[in-house]
Amino acid sequence: MGKKSFVKGAFILGIAGIVGKFIGAFFRIPLANIIQPEGIGLYQMAYPVYIALLTISTAGLPTAIAKMVAENLALGHNREAHRIFQISFKMLAILGIIATIILAAVTPLFAKFIQNDKVILPLLSIAPSLFFVSVMSAYRGYFQGMQMMGPTAVTQITEQIGKLVIGLSLAYALVGKGVEYGAAGAIIGVTLSEVIALGVIIYIYNKHKSEIEYGIRTSPKLERIPTSRSIISQLIKIAIPI
C-alpha cells in the first residue's frame, strides 16, 4: 500500500470512528432515560459477553485477510486474492455460527450464575449478530486488502445509525412490558443494524463484482496453488499475534 493510500485510508477510518462515537453518545443518553438504570444494567451485562465472544470468533482475522489479499494483489495474483476472501468468508461464517450457538447455549447458565433471569432476553437478542459481524469481517478484510477503506467506514456508520434509530425505537416500544424487554429492544437494534450493514457491504461488493471478475480472469494461474488448509493456517498465524 502506498503512503498516500495508507494516509487516505487511515483518514477515512478515523473520520468514521469519530462520527460513530458521536452517534454512539446520542444513543446512550436517551437510552438511559428510556430503560432506566436497571435496563442499562442489563444492557451492560449482555454487551460485554457479546464483545468477548465476537473477539474470540474474529480475533485479528480481518487484518490478516487484508494483509494476505494485499500481498497477492501486489503480485498481480487477483485470482488467489479472491480465493483467500472466499475461504476466509466460509471460515468466519462457520465461526460466527458456532459463536452464536455457544452464546445461546450458555445464556441460561450465565443468568443462573449471576442470579438474574432478566439478562436472558437481551443476551439471546444479540446472539445472532455474532454471525452477521463475522461474515462482514471477511468483506471488510477483502476491501481493505484492495486499499478500499470506504466500505468499512460506511458499514461502521451504518451500524451506529441503525443502532440509534432501531434500538431506541424498539426500546421505547417494548419497555412498557418490563425493563428486560426494553434492554432487549435496544440490543435487537444492534443485531438489525449489523444485518443492514452486512447488506450494505454485500451491495458494495456486487457493485465492484465486474471489476473483481475482470481481475480474476486476467490473473495468471499459479503453478503451485496453496491448499485451503494452508491458507487458513497462514491466516491464523498472522491473526493470533494481533
Regions found by a protein language model. Give the residues of each.
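Interfacial/gating helices of multi-pass transporter permease domains
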Residues: 31-55, 179, 183-184, 229-235
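Helix-terminus/linker motif at the lipid-water interface of multi-pass membrane proteins
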Residues: 22-40, 111-112, 173, 239-242
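Short membrane-interface helical motifs at transmembrane helix boundaries
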Residues: 98-118
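N-terminal membrane topogenesis motif
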Residues: 1-23, 79, 83, 222-242
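Alpha-helical transmembrane segments of multi-pass membrane proteins
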Residues: 117-139
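Membrane-interface helix-loop junctions in multi-pass transport and translocation proteins
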Residues: 149-150, 161-204
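Small-residue-rich midsections of specific transmembrane alpha-helices
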Residues: 44-70, 131
